[in-house]
């Protein structure tokens, strides 16, 4: 039987874009990258685990903030080069800025306007972690 991971069209860096959506509202929470190991672990542990390109290592979403993403469903697009994670966002905050979604700016009149409130101060979220970005 063909390995389900072999069906994915990984990019030149061995990564696939992963979009996290709220499983109840459908709101897009964030986009990150996954390598083969991250996607396999996400499926086996039923929680979002990404690949941090900046840190060059696995990033277990919520490991510093507590804002874990519990996996409800995993979907693959028609070209097999993007995955969607339907998740329960623990704490209601996906973004390191303390907002529900990383997509909190809307293009209006030629400029990006911030439209979503900060739900929790990022310093309070990461005070025990030693840095500001998960």
Swiss-Prot record:
Record note on cofactor: Binds 1 Mg(2+) ion per subunit.
Pfam families named among the record's database cross-references: PRA-CH
Cellular component annotations (GO), alphabetically ordered: cytoplasm
Top EC class of this enzyme: hydrolase
Cofactor(s), by name: Mg(2+); Zn(2+)
EC code(s) of this entry: 3.5.4.19
Gene3D superfamilies documented for this protein: Phosphoribosyl-AMP cyclohydrolase
Compartments, as annotated in UniProt: Cytoplasm
InterPro entries: PRA-CH, PRib_AMP_CycHydrolase_dom, PRib_AMP_CycHydrolase_sf
Binding site for Mg(2+): 77, 79, 81
Keywords, ordered alphabetically: Amino-acid biosynthesis, Cytoplasm, Histidine biosynthesis, Hydrolase, Magnesium, Metal-binding, Zinc
Pathway: Amino-acid biosynthesis; L-histidine biosynthesis; L-histidine from 5-phospho-alpha-D-ribose 1-diphosphate: step 3/9
Known role: Catalyzes the hydrolysis of the adenine ring of phosphoribosyl-AMP.
Family matches, as PANTHER family: HISTIDINE BIOSYNTHESIS BIFUNCTIONAL PROTEIN, HISTIDINE BIOSYNTHESIS BIFUNCTIONAL PROTEIN HIS7
Subunit record text: Homodimer.
Family: Belongs to the PRA-CH family.
Protein name according to UniProt: Phosphoribosyl-AMP cyclohydrolase
